[in-house]
């Protein structure tokens, strides 16, 4: 380490106007410029980028690492992060404009005593790029954006980031990389780099956050550390396609009920639903929850969705084995079945166990829809208790 407290890492390609304001905000931090470095991981070589960075060279400890490889956000983040020399790695976006006090507060309140934690700051204004495509934007001067941020921070709707307005039940699901930090030593020891198999926009940061959480690092929300999301052009259809593909990749890599719920309901809504979802699983299963049994039937891949499992994820009995070929290896995957990590028609037989009918309607219907999507043939077992319908109790989506 070089004595630098923070390494601020920014992934970049072709977003010059946003980056210029982001750098201006960093140059105006109350933390001394000698205490932090800014590393731009740029997936391009361009005169324009160098020209935009040059005016900040006497105001910031600024490093630009360039690559001509194809742009992917995880790759650009890793490019910057592998050049970091500070005690703490801070990930922001090229469209994140930090409040002047952000870095000093972040270090003093989260890392000054060597804490091994992951701090998530507020990034407000994500709604300025929702609702469809954005072909062009007009960015205002830094001072105007700062005034808008100050007004929000002093208003009655604060905290304004939607993640900070629901219960934080699934820690990794709020690990958006608009403003997030963790010790560089943890990055190195636990290999907490971004998975470069994730392509395009969406879910690469959540999968990274999942691994941060799995490493035993607490993820903590810090409403007092915040920034503004700057508007930028946006292709909503393209983002939706890559987000869906990345969600599937995430679930295939980490097939777990929390991942499954966030893939179905989204990160904010999934956090809100998690306690009632777990309670609904316990009621319907008569155990800790459900698993999906995977094996072969008549030589083809088969699923049995809705196997009651205990708290360790083991089936409460061996009844599920009778649905598969004799002697077949049967694996229990810790999923309910509301989202399944299979391509359409990949499974020969999808069987839905009877207790799935006892789930709240939204979850039951999601299971049935997924079974139909991934299976060439579907069998739904009748439930004599629920009579084919959902039992009362529990929240829907």
Residue ranges of model-derived segments:
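Short, flexible, basic/aromatic active-site loop/helix in glycosyltransferases
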Residues: 139-172
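Acidic donor-binding segment of Leloir-type glycosyltransferases
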Residues: 26-66
């Amino acid at each position: 380490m070089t004595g630098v407290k923070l390494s601020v890492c920014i992934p970049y390609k072709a977003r010059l106007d946003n980056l210029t304001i982001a750098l201006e905000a960093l140059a105006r931090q109350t933390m001394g410029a000698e205490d932090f470095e800014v590393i731009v991981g740029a997936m391009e070589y361009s005169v324009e980028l160098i020209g935009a960075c040059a005016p900040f060279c006497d105001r910031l400890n600024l490093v630009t690492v360039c690559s001509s490889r194809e742009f992917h956000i995880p790759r650009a983040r890793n490019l910057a992060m592998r050049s970091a020399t500070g005690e703490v790695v801070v990930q922001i976006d090229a469209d994140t404009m930090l409040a002047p006090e952000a870095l000093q507060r972040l270090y003093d309140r989260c890392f000054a005593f060597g804490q091994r934690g992951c701090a998530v700051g507020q990034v407000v204004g994500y709604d300025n790029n929702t609702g469809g495509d954005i072909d062009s934007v007009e960015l205002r001067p830094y001072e105007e954006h700062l005034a808008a941020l100050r007004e929000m921070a002093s208003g009655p709707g604060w905290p304004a980031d939607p993640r900070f307005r629901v219960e934080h039940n699934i820690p990794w699901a709020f690990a958006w990389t608009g403003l997030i930090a963790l010790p560089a030593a943890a990055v190195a020891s636990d290999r907490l780099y971004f998975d470069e198999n994730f392509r395009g926009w969406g879910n690469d940061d959540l999968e990274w956050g999942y691994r941060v959480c799995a490493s035993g690092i607490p993820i903590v929300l810090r409403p007092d550390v915040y920034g503004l999301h700057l508007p930028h052009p946006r292709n909503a259809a393209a983002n939706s396609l890559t987000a869906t593909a990345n969600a599937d990749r995430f679930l295939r890599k980490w097939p777990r009920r929390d991942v499954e719920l966030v893939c179905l309901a989204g990160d904010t809504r999934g956090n809100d639903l998690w306690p009632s979802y777990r309670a609904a699983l316990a009621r319907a299963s008569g155990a800790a929850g459900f698993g999906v049994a995977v094996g072969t039937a008549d030589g083809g891949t088969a699923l049995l969705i809705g196997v009651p499992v205990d708290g360790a994820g083991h089936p409460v009995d061996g009844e599920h084995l009778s649905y598969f070929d004799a002697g077949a290896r049967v694996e229990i995957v810790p999923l309910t079945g509301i989202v399944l990590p299979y391509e359409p028609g990949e499974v020969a037989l999808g069987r839905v166990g009877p207790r799935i009918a006892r789930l709240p309607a939204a979850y039951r219907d999601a299971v049935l829809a997924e079974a139909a999507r991934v299976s060439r043939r579907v069998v739904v077992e009748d439930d004599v208790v629920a009579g084919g319908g959902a039992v009362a109790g529990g929240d829907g989506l």
